Amino acid sequence: MSEDRIPTAILGAPGYIGQHFARLLADHPSFDLPILLAGERSGGRRLEEVWQLADAPPAELAHARLERRTAAGLARAGVRVTFSALPSGTAGPIETELVRRGVSVFSNAADHRMDAAVPLLVPEVNADHLRLAGRRASGRGLLVTNPNCSAAGLVLALSPLVPLLRPRAIHVSTYQSLSGAGYPGVPSLAITDNVVPFIASEEEKIERESARILGTRSGRRIAPARFPLVAHCARVATREGHLEAVTVEAEQSPALGEIEDALRGFDPLAWRNLPTAPHPPIELRHESDRPQPLRDRWAGRPARARGMAVTVGRLRWAPPYLRMFVLSHNAVRGGAGGSVLNAELALDEGMIPGERGGRR
């Protein structure tokens, strides 16, 4: 264990998001090599035995054993930060117990996203919402969530446009990849030669979570964005990357050049040293046929931030309607990468109890 890095663990390490966590944390400058946690089915196996991602498992973790430990056991082992890839329903009580024992949790699960005192973060959009956590009781950890995978990319693309356009309403239709259902995902016979126009609870999550993230903080309360946001969701036969068709009905009528400048110039984390933050976080394409999942899902610079940028294209402005396509990597920006970036922000703000490093 490195003495200048924070001890960590991954909850649900064998899963699709868990493996992306392992990839992102294997050589992280602030977080130490994680303890890999699994359930009864995978416990005791090596990470390489359960690996499903296209790239090989990171060498630092390939031979690591998947362990079964309790929250108390993790706290006794000195773990300060956990990254949760547990399924919703399972995650809630485990995350609560970890926080009670002083272990901070950065969660990809839905269980606590709408809790009043729990930040629901996309750092480029609402970093100030981290203050919802306030001053915690002595010995308690920090709990931070990232949003639904489609909402994560959507709000990032909308953030520079909301003050410029003052939306009356926003409509989004999503074309979501198979990996959004986890591994092994959707049965092949259900999706081959097909589009499935329903994903359980997805539309409600996008609408509710986006309104909260784009809302305004006053003390420890969030006033949700006041404009309606309406979502339609479909599952399509792409492997990774969620594509979204977005229409904004605007109150203001800036020039198209102002809209493009707002998207290109948006980089609110540029002054922070957050290793997983992409610069810029929005990549604007002018080709008639972009963005595409196959070509654009790994957008993001520097190399550690691959998959963390959103790509915006087919920008069409006929006031009061702005139309565009938005693409994001559902497992990186919309999953493990979002949680890691949240942890980097919390560390930079000095909000991880027992941290090694941080600004204060």
Predicted segments — roles?
Residues S179-R360:
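Charged docking surfaces used in two-component/phosphorelay signaling
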